[in-house]
Amino acid sequence: FIQSFDSDMLKYLRHELKTRIKLVQLLGENRWRLSDTDFSYLKTEEGMKEVSEYADGIGPWMNQLVTGVDFSGKAQITDLLKIARNNDLWIHPYTFRVDRLPSYTSSFDELLDLFFQEVGVDGIFTDHPDQAVRYLEQNSSN
């Protein structure tokens, strides 16, 4: 995989260089000023359709997919998941860290369980691959 916040670079790789390598459009927030890419636009139906023309998946910030959990513990999933799925895009959110858990989880395994089991992501970006692999091996249905 090649992942980038820069949509122009990913378009160049796919359309000009004709790469067959899997490409992931990373999604940030415009206020972060990571590139000239308009992330607000890319998160729309029209924007995600455009992403599907040059990328195989998206890499959203985890908070762009889940904003928290409700009183029963069910994830509050944003429309971004559905929009990406409607455009046949893989979803690999970032960055899952043992030492920086969101307020709605109390452990790394709980965070992984929420995203893999309830949200249904295809993969993740993590700084703790050993723990992610252990989780996946223990929770694999194969």
PLM regions and their residue ranges:
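Catalytic cores of phosphodiester-bond hydrolases, prominently lipid phosphodiesterases
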Residues: 1-142
